[in-house]
A protein has these predicted regions:
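Eukaryote-skewed repeat-based solenoidal scaffolds used as protein-protein interaction platforms
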Residues: 138-240, 244-274, 279
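Catalytic cores of extracellular degradative/oxidative enzymes
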Residues: 55-59, 64-65, 72-81, 90-91, ...
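Extended amphipathic alpha-helical segments with heptad-repeat/coiled-coil character used for oligomerization
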Residues: 248, 259-325
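Alpha-helical protein-protein interaction elements
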Residues: 13, 18-19, 59, 223, ...
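Ser/Thr/Asn(+Pro)-rich, low-complexity disordered segments
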Residues: 21-186, 208-219, 310-547
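Generic preference for well-ordered secondary structure
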Residues: 47, 118, 171, 175, ...
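N-terminal Sec-pathway targeting helices
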Residues: 1-22
Length: 547
């Protein structure tokens, strides 16, 4: 009996670490995962830059001024640092305010942890947030002794920017699985840039030689993978802001291929934003942080605020209100990256009608959108199971109005209210279908009601037609001379409304067949004009469609 108890206890003692490791890997492993190589598609990422951006704008100055008035607090060893601290330091130095106070403050602080996700075996993890955020202090003010005192600069290098040397890694500390994308980018960009600064300032120690210590090769390969297979934490709320800031640091301060790949990724994700946003309204599906519900705000996400800053530097007369996200917007306000001309054009004013599918690779869902000068119809996507960490959204119609929240928009989703069960990819050019009702915002007046269709005027010659019942919602954008002509065109092309559950002949000529009960990893659309479409999400190209 005693021997059995000993065996039992030994089994438990040896098994618990393995169980812990497996559990963390399964439930919390948020590192990059890649599948097949994504095709680029038929739409190129714009690169041409001719816009003469201004050096300052009212929005930029407001952001810097906001942070220059912030409060700084002392750091406690082992505790996460309030990220308002580095932003306030940057704001003050950028504004040239509170210089003595900020220098004395920095001299009292020391690193409180190490890089990587915080967990049981890495209880002081998460310091990469701080290292990434303080990196611009060194590069922007290291040669300005009137702002960053020499003694403070030395202390910053030795005691605050402590992620350095060799040791590039993608992994969560003390594990064999990959850390999250934003953690890797924050930690390894901070390591790379500190090493680079040390070498440029006379430290020839081999451990700081990025070209020979594995750091440059590792970071370059990681960035190349992101560019080739797609951003894993696409549109992430809140982590996109930290990924973005890391990439902007590399664009501003790195050299060679590391800088080039960081810039390519920025160009790629900004093009995605330009196509799937409308006047800074942006409500795409995203990966991480997984939540049981999603924000209903349709403006001022962490990507929008970046474009708002750059738009203000292009045209300071634009009416832009950054109500949230100033912490992320600071990076756009202080660093030199600027989007390509076409990105700004499509962000601010859609030049023509278009339809685009944008793939996000392994175990993901695509972004699909269709728009014109006066509207954008944006598909909500589909969750791939809790471990995919994807939060999908309703399919939304953005109009040229003052809407700020989901309830103020035309939108549709289904079946039911649990977004985990939705497949909101029933979407093609100027057409959306879902196994649920269409929500019509309060106060929207119909231009015509005809045979269960409600016709709303979007702009001159462009109408929204809505069909909505318990398990079927259709939103159709129709170009016609009048609401009556729009309704007649729908009726003439679709004589049997019972077929709405499986097919629709659009007045624009497209014959669309779909399956509202499609699996969550499959595009709801089956065929267009009797030609089967590629329905597998993880095979959809980066950018494909008509623009």
């Amino acid at each position: 009996m005693k021997k059995k108890w000993i065996i039992f206890i030994v089994t438990i003692v040896l098994g618990l670490p393995l169980l812990l490791y497996a559990s963390i890997s399964f439930f919390a492993g948020a590192g990059r995962k890649i599948g097949d190589l994504l095709p680029k598609g038929n739409i190129e990422i714009p690169l041409k830059r001719t816009i003469q951006y201004k050096n300052t704008s009212q929005i930029q100055e407001e952001i810097i001024d906001y942070w220059s008035k912030g409060k700084v607090t002392d750091w406690v060893d082992g505790e996460k640092i309030n990220l308002k601290n580095p932003r306030t330091v940057l704001g003050c130095l950028l504004a040239g305010k509170r210089v003595e106070e900020i220098n004395q403050y920095l001299l009292k602080q020391k690193a409180t942890g190490r890089e990587g996700s915080r967990w049981l075996l890495n209880p002081k993890g998460g310091y990469d947030f701080n290292a990434m955020a303080f990196t611009p202090v060194l590069f922007l003010f290291g040669d300005k002794p009137e702002l960053l005192y020499p003694e403070t600069k030395k202390h910053l290098v030795n005691n605050i920017l402590t992620i350095e040397g060799d040791g590039f890694t993608r992994n969560v500390p003390f594990t064999g699985f990959q850390d999250s994308e934003n953690h890797v980018l924050m930690a390894e960009s901070a390591r790379y840039l500190k090493n680079q600064w040390l070498r440029e300032n006379g430290n020839k120690s081999p451990e700081y030689d990025n070209k020979n210590n594995g750091v440059e090769a590792g970071l370059k390969e990681y960035l190349k993978e992101i560019y080739t297979y797609g951003v894993y934490e696409f549109n992430s709320d809140p982590y996109l802001g930290y990924t973005y800031s890391s990439l902007l640091n590399l664009n501003a301060f790195a050299t060679g291929e590391v800088q080039e790949f960081a810039t390519k990724i920025l160009d790629m994700i900004n093009w995605q934003y330009a196509l799937n946003s409308y006047k800074f309204k942006h409500f795409p599906p995203y990966r991480r942080l997984f939540k049981d519900s999603f924000s209903k705000e349709i403006v001022s996400d962490y990507h929008s605020v970046m474009l708002m800053v750059w738009a203000s530097l292009q045209n300071d007369s634009l009416k832009i209100d950054i109500t949230q996200g100033k912490h992320v917007a600071l990076w756009a306000a202080m660093l030199p990256y600027r989007p390509a001309d076409k990105v700004m054009e499509w962000t601010l004013n859609k030049p023509n009608a278009y339809f685009v599918k944008m793939g996000h690779g392994y175990n993901s869902c695509p972004e699909i959108c269709s728009g014109d000068k006066s509207y954008l119809l944006s598909a909500g996507g589909s969750n791939q199971g809790r471990r995919s960490m994807i939060v999908n959204k309703p399919t939304v119609l953005f109009l040229d109005d003052n809407s700020q929240t989901l309830i103020e928009t035309f939108h549709a989703y289904g079946p039911g209210e649990d977004f985990m069960k939705w497949n909101n990819t029933g979407f093609y050019e100027d057409f959306a279908c879902t196994k649920g009702v269409v929500h019509i915002p309060e106060g929207k007046m119909t231009s015509l009601t005809s045979d269960e269709w409600q016709i709303f005027t979007i702009s001159e010659g462009i109408y929204l037609a809505v069909f909505s019942e318990k398990e079927l919602g259709l939103m159709v954008i129709v170009r016609a001379k009048s609401p009556e002509d729009a309704a007649n065109a729908i009726r003439q092309n679709n004589t049997d409304k019972n077929l709405y559950h499986t097919q629709f002949k659009h007045p624009n000529g497209n014959f669309i067949e779909y399956d509202l009960d499609s699996p969550k990893d499959t595009w709801v659309i089956k065929s267009v004009n009797n030609k089967p479409v590629n329905r597998q999400f993880d095979q959809l190209p980066f950018f494909e469609g008509n623009i």
